[in-house]
Amino acid sequence: MGYYSLTEITAVQYAKDHGYFEAKANVVCHEIGDGNLNYVFKLDDGEKSIIIKQALPYAKVVGESWPLSIKRATIESKALQIFAQYVPDYVPAVYSHDEELAITVIEDLSRLTITRKGLIGGEEYPLLSQHIGRFLAHVLFYTSDFGLQSEEKRVLEGTFVNPDLCKITEDLVFTDPFGHYDTNDYEPDLQLVVDELWSDKTLKLKVAQYKYKFLTRKETLIHGDLHTGSIFSSPSETKVIDPEFATYGPFGFDIGQFIANLLLNALSREEEKRSVLFFHIEKTWSYFVETFTKLWIGEGVEVYTKEKQWLPIILQNIFTDAVGFAGCELIRRTIGLAHVADLDEIENKETRIQAKKQALSLGKELIKYESKSADIQLFRTLFQQTVSGGVKA
């Protein structure tokens, strides 16, 4: 039959045909996706529920003028299954994958809340940083040359060649926000600040280096889009979703993206309500380092992991990259194609514009920063130096 796009009606029929529900079951189906690239359906018969996710052959946010390969659905499914090998508690269960229709049937996580939405609403998620730090340490270690035999890593790397989605990252994170491109999207009130950013040659030289790292450093399997909208949370659970951007890339990329999105939420808050975000930023790194170090010592397969002075060098390199990647993410989420609700939903226009100017300034500082030690307090320090006051209540 070939590929076709599901509707709420055909999604129910697909689920019944594949044994998820009885033929006579009264299944309620709603399209719940709010992302840019896929359809997401929730199906529930009152006793059990599932999620059906289908990749579209184009970017939903733009339309059919932006074609995309549906093979990204297979990459996403494989990534979730690999993550589950190392950190099953931190990803949804994958029930099945249909490569022809680009459909993945996965666990319903409706008991949880999208982390971005929860943080905007004032939730604190006390275990978020512990869970994400450990998730990152396990996945990044075990899919790298440190935790995987080199020949196995090369085979795995080949299964995550993801040109369409990598091109989106190359353009929307590292290129378009730093020049005159049609994809950019920002308020006219930001034009002077944007012009200054675009004319900053020192900044562009640093961004060029971070883009080159993303293009060339195939160090480990990265999620590729690890922001707070790609995580479900509750006070006791954390689940990472949507790794359709998964590819082999730099160790620091996912860490930087996650931290940047916590910073974006901090920018949207009153000053006295920001401390929980810095707690999570700092604890994410400390849990990552603690877990990565244990794995390095106990599970390392690369012979030189026995050299005691190498691990600090690796961690310093990861941290340096994370700082720069965080800066790029701050800028692209402020003036690029895909914004974040943390800033866009600030009701007062003057306050919103000020927060976005601060995001751009902080992004520039992070990109330009020359870190000499892996001091996670850096994010708090640069934030305080760059941002004065907070959003007014």
Curated annotation (Swiss-Prot):
Superkingdom of origin organism: Bacteria
Membrane-spanning residues: none
Key words, A-Z: Amino-acid biosynthesis, ATP-binding, Kinase, Methionine biosynthesis, Nucleotide-binding, Transferase
GO MF term list: ATP binding; S-methyl-5-thioribose kinase activity
Keyword Glycoprotein carried by entry: no
Record-listed E.C. numbers: 2.7.1.100
Catalysed reactions, as listed in the record: 5-(methylsulfanyl)-D-ribose + ATP = 5-(methylsulfanyl)-alpha-D-ribose 1-phosphate + ADP + H(+)
Pathway field: Amino-acid biosynthesis; L-methionine biosynthesis via salvage pathway; S-methyl-5-thio-alpha-D-ribose 1-phosphate from S-methyl-5'-thioadenosine (hydrolase route): step 2/2
One BP annotation, GO: L-methionine salvage from methylthioadenosine
Binding residue positions for ATP: N38, K53, E107, D108, L109, D242, P243, E244
InterPro entries attached to this UniProt entry: Aminoglycoside_PTrfase (IPR002575), Kinase-like_dom_sf (IPR011009), Methylthioribose_kinase (IPR009212)
SUPFAM superfamilies for the chain: Protein kinase-like (PK-like) (SSF56112)
UniProt binding sites for substrate: D225, R332
Function in brief: Catalyzes the phosphorylation of methylthioribose into methylthioribose-1-phosphate.
Subunit structure and binding partners: Homodimer.
Family: Belongs to the methylthioribose kinase family.
Name this polypeptide is given: Methylthioribose kinase
